[in-house]
Amino acid sequence: MATKVYIVYYSTYGHVERLAQEIKKGAESVGNVEVKLWQVPEILSDEVLGKMWAPPKSDVPVITPDELVEADGIIFGFPTRFGMMAAQFKAFFDSTGGLWKTQALAGKPAGIFFSTGTQGGGQETTALTAITQLTHHGMIYVPIGYTFGADMFNMEKIKGGSPYGAGTFAGADGSRQPSDIELKQAFHQGMYIAGITKKIKQTSA
């Protein structure tokens, strides 16, 4: 039976979604792994989103809390708001109380990825505060560490991401798109976490 990896994200302007697409490619590069992209529900009105100049959402399906249980491993992605995950994603986690009560997600590997506007925008604080959500669910947090190799030490270019997970800088006006090195790190994260998820499933079978 194939290992199921879900990539669950929220994206306002497409930066997190672009990383999610690359993470999906990386996870799919691991044999016998099925990967699915999901969005979390939007909580802002169309009026507010319009004033934010947010583009229309893609056709990626919106997930419900109960659907998380179907996955063997989950990679969560979100933009940063004042140093922590966006309210849309926090609202989704807040809706998983039923899963918390039964510990339905306990033992599942989980990773995180993120986007900030600037280099001081909170990439690591967002990761650190997100880990609390995984902890209360009993999930196994899987950071990428320095497994991405030499590019983790690249100082020649602006680069998002960290040992906590893949990341990108959107720029203060959102005009900067994920760079090649950021996309490569996202691919690596998908491949890395899918591989670990597959190993855990095989050993627990």
UniProtKB/Swiss-Prot annotation:
Domain Flavodoxin-like: 5-192
Cofactor(s) annotated in UniProt: FMN
Domain of life of the native organism: Eukaryota
Annotated positions binding FMN: 11-15, 112-165
Cofactor details (free text): Binds 1 FMN per monomer.
Keywords recorded for this protein, A-Z: Flavoprotein, FMN, NAD, NADP, Nucleotide-binding, Oxidoreductase
Catalytic activity: a quinone + NADH + H(+) = a quinol + NAD(+); a quinone + NADPH + H(+) = a quinol + NADP(+)
Ways its activity is controlled: Inhibited by dicumarol.
EC assignment: 1.6.5.2
A Pfam cross-reference name: FMN_red
Induction per the UniProt record: Up-regulated by 2,6-dimethoxy-p-benzoquinone (DMBQ), 2,6-dimethylbenzoquinone and menadione. Not regulated by host root contact.
GO MF terms, alphabetically ordered: FMN binding; NADH:ubiquinone reductase (non-electrogenic) activity; NADPH dehydrogenase (quinone) activity
Cellular component GO terms, alphabetical: membrane
Family statement: Belongs to the WrbA family.
Alphabetized NCBIfam families for the sequence: flav_wrbA (TIGR01755), PRK03767.1 (NF002999)
Function: NAD(P)H:quinone oxidoreductase reducing quinones by a two-electron transfer mechanism. Can use either NADPH or NADH as electron donor. Can use menadione, 5-hydroxy-1,4-naphthoquinone (juglone) and 2,6-dimethoxy-p-benzoquinone (DMBQ) as substrates. Mitigates the toxicity of exogenous quinones in the rhizosphere.
Entry protein name: Quinone-oxidoreductase QR2
Lineage: Eukaryota, Viridiplantae, Streptophyta, Embryophyta, Tracheophyta
